[in-house]
Swiss-Prot record:
Family classification: Belongs to the aconitase/IPM isomerase family. LeuC type 1 subfamily.
NCBIfam families, A to Z: leuC, PRK05478.1, PRK12466.1
The keyword Manganese belongs to this UniProt entry's keyword annotation: no
Cofactor note: Binds 1 [4Fe-4S] cluster per subunit.
Protein name as it appears in the record: 3-isopropylmalate dehydratase large subunit
Protein origin, superkingdom: Bacteria
Cofactor names: [4Fe-4S] cluster
Residue stretches in coiled coil: none
Gene Ontology molecular function: 3-isopropylmalate dehydratase activity; 4 iron, 4 sulfur cluster binding; metal ion binding
GO biological processes: L-leucine biosynthetic process
Length: 468
């Protein structure tokens, strides 16, 4: 019987499945951070339980860490307490921790892949909704809640219902200047933010295959933003080349055996999907969100939609509310909209290729007057590599702030946030009301588009700019 990649991954991890009950599946890798883990560890202590497989759990600090210093208290008392608790809990339960001063510290979804903790065929969980990022490697990866974090720590398993199967194919090749972020925003614009609800999405097609692993991670990272449980991409030679020689990747004969297995991880010919969506890559423009969810997105040269022209009353009401919050009129182009801040970072776009793309725009230019622009590498290793390449100097000379690794302005859980009414061009994944700070207005874009907005003080079409 033909199977989808998702079915192969799920079936390979079923520990127990009884009639009428939710299947119990095995978890290969558990990634932990400071925000969703304290209560889980407290639960273990209260019941006198240990962590069943400490070697399969790795922790880092990311959400609360300040990016202008390595002071634990730099983001406030709550952040300090959570980071101190994580250090205490990981030491007590024998779990590896990349703390705030470790070179491997970083955003959990950047750190995992670059260490080789993320491998094809795995099941991976983390108490964070963007765990889908790891699906770029042909892994089944999804976010879990704090009570589930405790369950995985104690049992290395989790109850998980089977999801519906969705295929999103991006046909052909993208045009110059189009990034993975533009691809996934265009996908969400077509499916809407609820189009993938109840599904695990497999991304495929020539445009997806052409992406680097970092680009694929950007796409899978935002699968959750179309409502999906997770997103996956079948592994291939690009995957294997990325993983080769990573610290936690198999070595020697084990590597050869692993690759032989990984090559079987693809959807069979004739495998059936519940939903199929197709996009033409050549039609994708640089994308910018105009509203308060990632599905409210347009190409840079398109006008903001007029809610009155929307036939669906719910969609119309949502658009009206979004435009009111964003303080934007309909029918104008976003190239007419000025911005106050720029954020280049997050688990979506803080890897070395993202920083190179932004630096190519920033080089030889200056941040516009009145604009604050932050560049926040996704990990200590990304920061180290960027500095080896001189990217930090490019950003600093252009007037960007070169920060330390962390989640930063993606979410208002640290000191990097928007003030009420401020408008931000952001490479993050969510533009919800208040996401980057109470009353803040977020526009999601690619790293190159964000850098260009910083330089020009407004949104521009990067395809018209000379790269350096």
């Amino acid at each position: 019987m033909s199977k989808t990649l998702y079915e192969k991954l799920f079936d390979a991890h079923v520990v127990h499945e009884a009639n009428g009950e939710t299947p119990l599946i095995y978890i290969n890798r558990h990634l932990v951070h400071e925000v969703t883990s304290p209560q889980a560890f407290d639960g273990l202590r209260a019941m006198g339980r240990s962590v069943r497989q400490p070697s399969k759990t790795v922790a880092t600090m990311d959400h609360n860490v300040p990016t202008d210093s390595r002071d634990l208290a730099g983001s406030g008392e709550m952040g300090r307490v959570q980071m101190v608790e994580l250090a205490k809990n990981t030491e007590q339960f024998g779990i590896t921790l990349y703390d705030i001063n470790h070179i491997n510290q970083g955003i959990v979804h950047v750190m995992g892949p670059e260490q080789g903790l993320t491998l094809p065929g795995m099941t991976i969980v983390c108490g964070d909704s963007h765990t889908a990022t790891h699906g770029a490697f042909g892994a089944l990866a999804f976010g879990i809640g704090t009570s589930e974090v405790e369950h995985v720590l104690a049992t290395q398993t989790i109850k998980q219902a089977r999801a519906k199967k969705m295929k999103i194919e991006v046909r052909g090749k993208v045009r110059d200047g189009i990034s993975a972020k533009d691809i996934v925003l265009a996908i969400i614009g077509k499916t809407t933010m609820g189009g993938g609800t109840g599904h695990v999405v497999e991304f495929c097609g020539e445009a997806i295959r052409d992406l680097s692993m970092e680009g694929r991670m950007t796409v899978c990272n935002m699968a959750i933003e179309l409502g999906a449980k997770s997103g996956i991409i079948a592994p291939d030679e690009t995957t294997f080349a990325y993983l080769k020689d990573k610290p936690y990747a198999p070595k020697g004969k084990d590597w050869d055996e692993a690759v032989a297995y990984w090559q079987t991880l693809h959807s069979d010919e004739g495998a059936e999907f519940d939903t199929v969506v197709t996009l033409e890559a050549s039609e994708i423009e640089p994308q910018v969100t105009w509203g308060t969810n990632p599905g409210q997105v347009i190409g840079i040269n398109q006008p903001i939609p007029n809610p009155a022209e929307m036939s669906d009353p719910i969609e119309r009401q949502s658009a009206e509310k979004a435009l009111a919050y964003m303080d934007l009129p309909h029918s104008i182009k976003l190239t007419d909209v000025a911005i106050d801040k720029v954020f280049i970072g997050s688990c979506t776009n803080s890897r070395i290729e993202d920083l190179r793309a932004a630096a190519a725009i920033a080089k030889g230019r200056k941040v516009a007057d009145g604009v604050q622009a932050l560049v926040v590498p996704g990990s200590g290793l990304v920061r180290e590599q960027a500095e080896k390449e001189g990217l930090d100097k490019i950003f600093i000379e252009a007037g960007f702030e070169w920060r330390l690794p962390g989640c930063s302005m993606c979410l208002a859980m640290n000191n990097d946030r928007l003030a009420p009414g401020e408008r931000c061009a952001s490479t993050s994944n969510r533009n919800f009301e208040g996401r980057q700070g109470r009353g803040g207005r977020t526009h999601l874009v690619s790293p190159a588009m964000a850098a260009a907005a910083a330089v020009y003080g407004k949104f521009v079409d990067i395809r018209n700019l000379e790269l350096h």
